[in-house]
From Swiss-Prot:
InterPro entries: 6-PGluconate_DH-like_C_sf (IPR008927), 6PGD_dom2 (IPR013328), 6PGDH_NADP-bd (IPR006115), GLYR1_PWWP (IPR035501), HIBADH-like_NADP-bd (IPR029154), HIBADH-related_NP60_sf (IPR051265), NAD(P)-bd_dom_sf (IPR036291), PWWP_dom (IPR000313). Belongs to the HIBADH-related family. NP60 subfamily. GO terms for molecular function: DNA binding; NAD binding; NADP binding; nucleosome binding. This is Cytokine-like nuclear factor N-PAC. Pfam families: NAD_binding_11, NAD_binding_2, PWWP. Residues 9-70 form the PWWP domain.
Length: 566
């Protein structure tokens, strides 16, 4: 249904954002992320879904034009590849709107949420009904303390002018000290004073205008304490965002594509060609994340006996169907197996696996092996090593180099250090999940090597993202840039893969951006202890931190382009 402006949801339009040419878009229901952004514009605004970039933003109605009517005017307003992709998508939307429904999931969720104005009206009606019920039961006597009296006393306390110190007078409440207040109304008052700004301002206006009849100056709020007495308390300050215009002019983060479930029926050609002779030992695996799923699949397909555990138990079902056992806790995995692998998200979670409740240290570690595959710093690895050895166990750090695809194909690179005998016992597993495994000596060497390689990867990707952003702004075809790059000696599989993801504007997770930033942070920490300057790494780390703050932490690391582009 269209409103007074003539625009309705699903209308196709040209929307002009500050700093950009008119862009093909669609009038949309604002998703939850966009509703959180305060709109400080003089003119009415509409939520626009931008084709090509698949982003949302608030756009003033004065900057919106009907698509078909102004198509010829704006058709050549930009020469970028993303603009051409947007034109292609909007024409496809005109023919087959259902094809684009998966992109509008956030709108459907937002549509099911209660409207803030309706929620406010419900609260206001609750206050009004509470007033009537209280008045009917207790009458108008002040001694009986009706609900209107409570509201009047609160407003009186908040609207009384400030008394100068020289006057040496105190403002006292006119009501008796102990009050028997209707619980519903009391809760409503506190809710109004502590609610978010979008509702709180309306609530304050209602209390000021509807009860006292005049606006009150800014004062400390008078609230009722547990004993029913009026006390002066500082209400929690409402956070007021500064009017930062550039935040409104940046597209809202896109919904991260769901990671497809792993196909347990297939086996990669690389694994099949190796003729792996599986070890007779029993292996445990903690963590079935982006990398863990592919690793465990290849262990099972190569004939290894595996026991798995994951915080989200539903991820274990597919592996249980193909022969894996499922344990209830990390300590149970250790008890049931000879060697346990851990592959979780970060150093803190890795420590939780070992030292946490029902963790590895709760089990009998005598003669057992523990292999840490999580990307950690040398200090964390040494802490885990000392703990495992203190209980009679053996420790190996086996850092992995590669992405989700390489984990599923069994073509990772393993960097190991620690117990040499344990490294030899794990060779059949390493053969199933990697194309090469290296033993680097004492504990800590593998983690250092991994962080250095991640530095190279992170800095390179940040450079590719900035270069692609510049190419787009300069009017060059990003596809042409990649084609030329592929012919040079700078070309690499990673550059081309990430570059194609940037062109498509889709960032399915192969290596999460937050994990890349974590590795750069750990590398900087390592360098700080060695007093080694890393200015380029530090700058790259800030770029990833910014992209993560924009909401792209769970996207692929190539989403750092969004920060460079916008």
């Amino acid at each position: 249904m269209s409103d007074s402006t003539g625009y309705a949801v699903n209308d196709l339009v040209w929307a002009k954002m500050k700093g950009f040419s008119p862009w093909p878009g669609r009038i949309s229901v604002p998703p939850a992320e966009l509703r959180k952004i305060a709109v400080k514009k003089n003119n009415p605004v509409k939520c626009i879904f931008f084709f090509g970039s698949n982003n949302y933003a608030w756009i003033e109605e004065t900057q919106i034009k009907p698509y078909l009517q102004f198509k010829d005017t704006h058709l050549n307003s930009s020469k970028s590849a993303q603009f051409k992709e947007a034109l292609k998508q909007i024409e496809e939307f005109r023919v087959n709107p259902e094809k684009f429904q998966p992109l509008f999931v956030g709108e459907n969720e937002a549509a099911n949420r209660p409207d803030p104005d309706e929620e406010f009206n419900r609260l206001r009606e609750g206050v009004a009904s509470g007033t009537e019920e209280s008045g009917a039961e207790d009458g108008a006597s002040v001694n009986n303390t009706t609900t209107p009296a409570v509201l009047e006393s609160v407003d009186e306390a908040t609207s009384t002018p400030m008394v100068k110190k020289s006057a040496k007078k105190k403002v006292r409440a006119s009501l008796p000290i102990k009050l028997n207040v209707d619980k519903v109304v009391c809760e409503s008052i506190i809710t109004f004073q502590c609610s978010p700004r979008s509702v709180g301002n309306k609530a304050k206006a209602m209390l000021d205008d509807g009860v006292s009849g005049a606006p009150s100056p800014k004062r400390k709020k008078k609230l009722l304490n547990d004993s029913g007495e009026l006390s002066s308390l500082d209400a929690s300050p409402v956070r007021r965002n500064a009017p930062v215009t550039h935040l409104l002019n940046r597209p809202v983060t896109v919904t991260r594509p769901e990671t497809p479930e792993i196909d347990m029926s297939s086996v990669s050609n690389a694994v099949q060609s190796r003729n792996i002779k599986a070890s007779q030992l029993k292996f445990g695996f903690l963590g079935l994340g982006v990398m863990g799923c592919g690793i465990v699949k290849n262990l099972i397909k190569s004939g290894h006996s595996v026991v798995v555990w994951n915080r989200s138990a539903h991820k274990c079902r597919k592996f249980q169907e193909v022969g894996a056992e499922v344990a209830d806790t990390p300590s149970d995995v250790v008890e049931m197996t000879d060697v346990t692998y851990s592959c979780v998200s970060d150093p803190q979670v890795a420590k939780d696996m070992v030292f946490g409740n029902c963790g590895v240290m709760s089990a009998n570690l005598a003669g057992k092996g523990y292999v840490e595959m999580t990307g950690v710093d040398p200090e964390t690895s040494n802490d885990i090593n000392e703990a495992i050895i203190s209980k009679g166990g053996r420790y190996l750090e086996a850092q992995i180099q590669g992405s989700k695809n390489q984990a599923e194909e069994g073509t990772l690179i393993i960097l190991a250090s620690g117990d040499r005998l344990l490294f030899e016992e794990c060779q059949s597993c390493f053969e199933a999940i990697s194309r090469n495994s290296f033993y680097l000596g004492d504990v800590g060497n593998a983690t250092k090597m991994n962080l250095i390689l991640q530095m190279i990867s992170g800095i390179t990707l940040a450079g590719v993202a900035e270069a692609m952003a510049l190419a787009d702004r300069a009017g060059l075809q990003q596809k042409d840039v990649l084609e030329v790059l592929e012919l040079t000696n700078m070309s690499s599989e990673m550059m081309l893969q990430k570059g194609n993801a940037i062109i498509k504007g889709e960032f399915p997770t192969h290596h999460a951006l937050k994990h890349m930033q974590k590795d750069l942070k750990l590398a900087l920490s390592l360098a700080d202890g060695l007093e080694q300057s890393l200015p380029i790494t530090a700058a790259s780390n800030e770029v990833y931190k910014h992209a993560k703050r924009l909401g792209y932490g769970s996207h692929d690391a190539s989403a750092v382009y969004v920060r460079a582009r916008f």
